[in-house]
Each structure stands twice: as C-alpha cells, then as structure tokens.
C-alpha cells in the first residue's frame, strides 16, 4: 500500500520543496532583484552599455582569430594564466605576482568580497563603502556576499565629498572602499587630491580604485601602490573593444593576492579568453589605442553638440560615455529616444537629482549624428 506522501502530485511535492529550500536563502539575497538589461524592441543604435564600437582596424580581430586557431580545445586552461599575466605586466608595469585575474572585473570584485569578509570590531557583518552614484555591482555584490553597503553621496560636481567620506570610514570601519575613477555613471575622474586623501584615511581598510575607463583618461594612478600598500587597482579589457572576452584584473600587494587566489576557482579564465586577450595586448595594442584616441576625439565633438542644446548640461567626461542632465525629467527624453530607435541609460527611476540624468555611450560618427539629430527634435 502506498504512503499518502507518494500519492501527492509531483508538482505539489516540487512546490513544497522549493518553499523549503527558499527558507535556506540569506534574507539579503531573497530581497535582491536580478540584473536584467533593458532591451526594448526596435532599437537600431545601442548607446547604453559603454561598449566600444567595432574597431576601424581589422588587426584586432585578425590577431584574436590567429590566437584562437591554435587553442587545444581538449585541454583545460592554464590555471595561472601565465602568458596573459606576462602580457598585462608588459603593458602596465605591474609585477605578475601582484595580479589577480578574473572573468571581468565583476569576478574580481566577488573574490574580494568573499575573502575580505571578517566583521570588524564586533560588528554583526562586514561593511563595504562606496560613493553614490557609482557602479551598481559594488552594492549588489556586497549584499549578495553578506556585506552591509554604506553609500556616501557625491558633491554637487559629482566629486568626492572628502569630509563626509572620511567621517563614514571612521564611523562604519568598512572592510573595503570601492572608488571608480573615472566613475560610472558620472564619467568624471575624482580630483586626485581628494581621492588620495580618502584612500589614505585608514590603512586598515582595503581601498580599491576601479580604473575600468582609465584608457580614456590621462593615465593610471597605479604608482600610488608604492606608498599606499592597502590600495589596489581594478582594470578590464571590456571597455576598449573586446568585452566579449570578459577579462579583468586586480593589481594589489602580492601577499594579499596570494591569499585571495586561494579561493579563485581553478580554470576561471578559458583558454580562448586567455589566448585572445594575450594577442590583443601583444599584437594589436597600437590599434586598440588608436581606437581609444578616436573615441576621445568623437567624445569632444559630442560634448559640444549636446551642450549647445537648450537646457542640456554635460559633465566633463574622462570615459567613453557622457553624463547628461536633461532640461526636465529624463524619462520623456529617454522614451523619445527609444521611439527613434536609440537606447541610452536613464536614471529617472533612482529619483532625486538622478531623475534628470542620462548616461550616453560614445558611438560611431554615424550613431552620434543620429543621436544629436534626435535630441535636437526633442529639445524643440
């Protein structure tokens, strides 16, 4: 004779099991919403994701194809990514022992949050401190890893409020401070004096300067590590034309890198990604830099065009995108652009001073011209 439980419909048993398993979730994870990019139909020009447009030179693609053609697909990747680290070292000056590589900088952020997670001073949970607005993954990843996110508003010029930030560091004793410079979404680089004062405020805090967009700015600040050993630098290849490879890295004190590397999943970077990224760095870097220089030139032109529109204000940019204040709420401008087949990033849902802000990626000349023409119609 079958038991009552065996007579229950399978769907019912699955539902009960799912409810029981949901009880195992940490509350902060249950409260999160998965990141889903906005992808409305009819879009012909995507200027929302800070991706570089296709290269004007075939050399980058050709170098990648050559490198990938020699991959032994039946073998696991090099777990230490030796050749890629050496290529990064030659391009940046970083010691290979100071490099921690990940699947984009997102994985490196996750590794940092996993490793540097011991609560301080009898606190119930570790703390991550960031400015706001900034890269959303800091907050999302922090919550997912059980850290308490603390956010300090940027000042009226989208620069660091040093006094408020130092006070927050003193009061909350964070494990990690994330500082994107150039910042996403505002596009500007923080004033060097302010940034240095913040990262030097507490030597027991690990400060991460995220230089994802530094190729579009006036050079890295990585030399600071010589005097500030508790500062690390994040970099990525995603913003300079090879986002598909998903290669990022941290440069930090080798002793810390050695500890964090213990929890990095083996073979995290595929052989294809390693070979392709190495080829870009070794064989096509001059072409990449020409593409970056061309984007910077187009950025200057786009700033002039948009700033000339009545009521539009453009924050000076050190990245491959613009932070644009609209004459009124950003939502109607965003919707009108979508109706024209142009997708940008709107922050109207964030409210407050962000409700009038758009983030617009620098596109090709043709894409930028179409954007400006659309904005002119909207501004009438």
Regions found by a protein language model. Name each.
Residues 9, 72-204, 213-228, 232:
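Conserved core of the PLP fold type I
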Residues 57, 230-308, 313-314:
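PLP-dependent aminotransferase class I/II
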Residues 252, 324-328, 362-364:
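Short beta-strand-to-loop capping motifs
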Residues 27-29, 34, 316-317, 324, ...:
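Conserved PLP cofactor-binding pocket of PLP-dependent enzymes
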Residues 2-7, 339-340, 351-380:
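PLP-dependent enzyme catalytic core of the Aspartate aminotransferase-like
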